[in-house]
């Protein structure tokens, strides 16, 4: 993403990825303040894509919503602009077979919160073709995701 933004703008971008494999929104909430505080003043934008792992053993909608509220308000309190990605729809995976519809439920939460907390959404719709195992992206999928994030970031100008 940093390379793509630099190429498009002739400016220097550094992108940090603080994602942890298997992490839920509750896990991220526990460590988010420290991450955000350590980047206060240097990071201007915070991209957030969280919730796919919440579908494995579905996190209740009220808890997912509360986790997002706290994370997004922490982003804003640390002077950063939040952009939240919608969750890509999952295709077949044994681990998620019974809970794939939860991504749609979580996306409704994201869309509702965007109006109340005043943040932009980056749509990750129609990404199914890029899933290698029904859940995780191929290299091309991550490149497509970077293109979508970059368009949303550059639209802030």
Where are these regions (language model features)?
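A short beta-strand-loop structural module common to alpha/beta enzyme folds
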Residues: 8-24
């Amino acid at each position: 993403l940093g390379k793509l933004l630099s190429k498009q703008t002739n400016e220097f971008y550094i992108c940090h990825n603080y994602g942890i494999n298997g992490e839920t929104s509750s896990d991220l909430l526990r460590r988010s303040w420290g991450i955000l505080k350590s980047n206060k003043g240097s990071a201007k934008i915070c991209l957030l894509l969280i919730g796919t792992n919440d579908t494995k053993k579905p996190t209740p909608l009220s808890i997912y919503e509360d986790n997002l509220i706290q994370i997004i308000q922490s982003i804003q309190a640390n002077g950063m602009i939040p952009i939240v990605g919608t969750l890509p729809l999952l295709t077949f995976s044994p681990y998620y077979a019974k809970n794939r519809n939860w991504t749609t439920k979580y996306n409704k939460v994201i869309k509702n919160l965007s109006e109340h907390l005043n943040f932009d959404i980056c749509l990750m719709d129609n990404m199914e073709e890029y899933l290698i195992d029904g859940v995780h992206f191929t290299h091309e999928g991550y490149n497509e995701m970077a293109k979508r994030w970059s368009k949303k970031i550059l639209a802030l100008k």
